[in-house]
Amino acid sequence: MTFSLFGDKFTRHSGITLLMEDLNDGLRTPGAIMLGGGNPAQIPEMQDYFQTLLTDMLESGKATDALCNYDGPQGKTELLTLLAGMLREKLGWDIEPQNIALTNGSQSAFFYLFNLFAGRRADGRVKKVLFPLAPEYIGYADAGLEEDLFVSARPNIELLPEGQFKYHVDFEHLHIGEETGMICVSRPTNPTGNVITDEELLKLDALANQHGIPLVIDNAYGVPFPGIIFSEARPLWNPNIVLCMSLSKLGLPGSRCGIIIANEKIITAITNMNGIISLAPGGIGPAMMCEMIKRNDLLRLSETVIKPFYYQRVQETIAIIRRYLPENRCLIHKPEGAIFLWLWFKDLPITTKQLYQRLKARGVLMVPGHNFFPGLDKPWPHTHQCMRMNYVPEPEKIEAGVKILAEEIERAWAESH
């Protein structure tokens, strides 16, 4: 039995499948310290809220309705209307229900978008996806139907006090040409916790407009929900921007509900793709979200429960790291949002891929940084000096993991002398 080219491409071992397998193995391995995956925190107050909400929905028959009926291929009409109204009212955006489509998780939204705007055209030209600020999300790297669909730009690195640093878009060397089909940024960024500034975003928007290509913003952690963002950042949308959101980081990753906000032409295309690939998006997540909007809970919980929880967790985690790893051993990307810390082990004598294997052997899972630079034009040592860690677990788990990390860093340095 042999596979097609499509089959060959999508059965290869990719960074994202490896990550998900490690996550799964770790969840089943007693004592494993999971600092690798992207699972959001199970915040007690949110768990209680969802429990009550689902109980109410069962009693009123709304849960049964959502599970026993198909929604349309654009997604639940009631949610499209409620969400458009909320965004118009709260952010002043000129949005109607026909500017929104739902997908089965934002991972599938990106698969649709990358292959809509990049790849082979009718005239034979091949367009690419430009990531103007690498490192960028691991799950993008293999989502193209064509090979080599992605181009990443190296960032400028700003060194900050207290052993922190921040990546910025290097506009001076940013190349947008005939071959660029779309620009894509996550804000806040998974893996680094970086939030590109309002000024950088407006500049990217202007460049995208100038070249007649869309700017796609992955807003999985951003404002107005789930609000896991700790710096001042103004949400941006206009008809040339495709904004992607999700219910996962509210604490509902199992609902697999992605949200795309775009101009009507793009929404029509996404709706058609939904119909062909999955008939319709799942209904239970959207039904829950409808209730959350109607009860005025969606933005309230994002602001008063979710954001403060993660902010406290990230501060605790940085304090733990600094107890074991001084600035000369480990720099930390300024944590401006998302659920990860990005650690830079400058001049480390081993690669972070080797470090990952050593940590894994000791029951600690983190993600090596080289996976987050898809399509860099030339090798860059920095890509092998960074690791992503999830700061969501309990502080005692974080401490146990960081202690082992520090031991392995010291061991690597000792071996090099």
Swiss-Prot record:
Q: What are the UniProt keywords, alphabetically?
A: Aminotransferase, Cytoplasm, Pyridoxal phosphate, Transferase
State which gene encodes it.
avtA
Q: What is its EC number?
A: 2.6.1.66
Q: Which reaction does it catalyse?
A: L-valine + pyruvate = 3-methyl-2-oxobutanoate + L-alanine
Q: Which family does it belong to?
A: Belongs to the class-I pyridoxal-phosphate-dependent aminotransferase family.
* UniProt KW Transferase keyword: yes
The name under which this protein is listed is Valine--pyruvate aminotransferase
Q: Which organism is it from?
A: Escherichia coli (strain K12)
Q: Where in the cell is it found?
A: Cytoplasm
Query: Which domain of life does this protein belong to?
Result: Bacteria
Sorted alphabetically, which NCBIfam families does this protein's record hold? PRK09440.1-1 (NF006963), PRK09440.1-2 (NF006964), PRK09440.1-4 (NF006966), PRK09440.1-5 (NF006967)
Please list the GO terms describing molecular function: pyridoxal phosphate binding; transaminase activity; valine-pyruvate transaminase activity
What Pfam families is this protein classified in? Aminotran_1_2
Subunit arrangement?
Homodimer.
Q: Name one GO cellular component term.
A: cytosol
Instruction: Give any single GO term for biological process.
Output: alpha-amino acid metabolic process
Q: What class of enzyme is it?
A: transferase
Acyltransferase in keyword set: no
Cited function = Involved in the biosynthesis of alanine.
Co-factor requirement: pyridoxal 5'-phosphate
What is known about its induction? Modestly repressed by alanine and leucine via Lrp. Amino acid limitation causes repression by promoting the accumulation of L-alanine or L-leucine or both. AvtA is also repressed by L-alpha-aminobutyric acid and other nonprotein amino acids which are structurally similar to L-alanine.
Q: Which PANTHER family match?
A: AMINOTRANSFERASE, VALINE--PYRUVATE AMINOTRANSFERASE
